């Protein structure tokens, strides 16, 4: 589905991704089908919005389907993909450097084990998956990372970043702790099924029936959600109205330029046939003749140029507000004798760092869950780090 409509028309004011909750205290083979059935509607609702935001991030934006009622022969559709710029900045801010685990104990054995864990993560190319999941996280409001065993390898585990368009988590409505992670997948015959993980058991469900249930050794839910914030609001949807306005303004500006170039010629009190007019255009000269002294003939070019300066001022104002809302520094350089600290304060870098700190606890909490799963996989594969 193309992004022909605006996001507001899709979400009807319900911004942020819905969170799936259950009231059960323990997931079992007896209730897992019911729990997933009660939450699947939330997943499908989120899926449509996530698809819209992901395609918007990649450049499929409503301006591309713009229709005009007047002068429809001059219809420019310009996408200034600031959504991509925003997401890349946010991802670089959080995941630009590899995430490192550190020890809070002054213990040589613990410090050495933590260093080994960091080495395992580096060998598993975790940062690449961090960036991939970070793009989903910023663009759509949530993302997932998972750990799974890898046989016959120096690194006995894989880090993967499944798409939130086929993955969701279910939380307990009183403790807000994750109870279940679910993936909607296809088998080799093209049949849909759901693969779910609790902290102790994996479940396979097909056609509304539980067809497989078995214990796992992950030591926790192996698929971990990494929300962008507690409301799962994406960085794009916070300012999407202004991004659409910039696209519309730039498209109209190009229309104005094209209409100025493709001018109309007005003939007053004279008639020129098409053949004669084409000859005149080639020679860049016009000859007209007045019928009488009272009705003088004249030829004029009808143009009305758009005030580009005023348009740029309005556009800059919208973009400055966008950067302010997202706490992204502007690109103004140091034009005076300011110190580096003064430049950072003036251009918004300090504010940007403060905003980024609000996201750190969310990422740390999710990383701890993922690290526990990795440690259990290592333990099962005779690489117990004793952490």
Spans of model-derived segments:
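Extended, charged amphipathic alpha-helical segments
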Residues: 212-346
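C-terminal structural cap/anchor segments
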Residues: 321, 325-385
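Extended, regular secondary-structure scaffolds
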Residues: 131-232
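Short, charged/polar micro-motifs that form catalytic or ligand-binding hotspots
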Residues: 135, 301-312, 353-360
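Extended, helix-rich architectural segments
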Residues: 1-157
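Charge-rich, acidic-biased intrinsically disordered regions
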Residues: 11-40, 47, 109, 150, ...
């Amino acid at each position: 589905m193309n992004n022909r409509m605006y996001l507001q028309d899709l979400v009807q004011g319900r911004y942020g991704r819905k969170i799936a909750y259950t009231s059960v205290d323990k997931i079992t083979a007896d209730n897992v089908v019911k729990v997933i059935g009660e939450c699947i509607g939330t997943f499908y609702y989120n899926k449509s919005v996530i698809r819209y935001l992901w395609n918007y991030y990649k450049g499929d934006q409503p301006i591309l389907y713009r229709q005009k009622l007047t002068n429809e022969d001059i219809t420019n559709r310009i996408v200034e993909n600031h959504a991509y710029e925003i997401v890349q900045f946010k991802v670089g801010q959080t995941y630009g450097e590899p995430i490192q685990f550190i020890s809070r104990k002054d213990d040589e054995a613990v410090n050495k084990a933590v260093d080994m864990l960091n080495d395992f993560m580096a060998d598993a190319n975790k940062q690449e998956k961090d960036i991939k999941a970070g793009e989903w996280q910023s663009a759509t409001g949530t993302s997932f990372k998972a750990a799974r065993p890898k046989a016959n390898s120096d690194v006995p585990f894989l880090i993967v970043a499944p798409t939130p368009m086929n993955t969701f988590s279910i939380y307990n409505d009183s403790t807000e702790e994750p109870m279940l992670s679910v993936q909607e997948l296809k088998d080799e015959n093209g049949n849909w099924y759901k693969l779910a993980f609790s902290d102790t058991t994996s479940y396979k469900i097909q056609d509304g029936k539980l067809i497989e249930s078995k214990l796992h050794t992950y030591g926790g839910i192996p698929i971990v959600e990494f929300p962008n914030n507690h409301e799962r609001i994406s960085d794009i949807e916070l300012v999407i109205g202004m991004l659409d306005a910039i696209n519309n303004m730039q498209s109209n500006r190009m229309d104005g330029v094209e209409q100025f170039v493709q001018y109309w010629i007005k003939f007053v009190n004279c008639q020129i046939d098409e053949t004669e007019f084409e000859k005149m255009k080639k020679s860049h000269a016009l000859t007209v003749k007045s019928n009488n002294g009272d009705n003088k003939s004249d030829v004029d070019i009808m143009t009305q140029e758009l005030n580009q300066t005023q348009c740029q001022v309005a556009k800059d104002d919208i973009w400055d507000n966008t950067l302010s809302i997202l706490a992204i520094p502007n690109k103004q350089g140091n034009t005076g004798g300011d110190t580096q600290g003064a430049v950072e304060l003036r251009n918004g870098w300090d504010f940007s760092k403060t905003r980024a700190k609000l996201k750190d606890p969310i990422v740390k909490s999710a990383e701890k869950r993922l690290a526990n799963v990795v440690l259990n996989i290592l333990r099962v594969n005779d690489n117990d780090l004793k952490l």
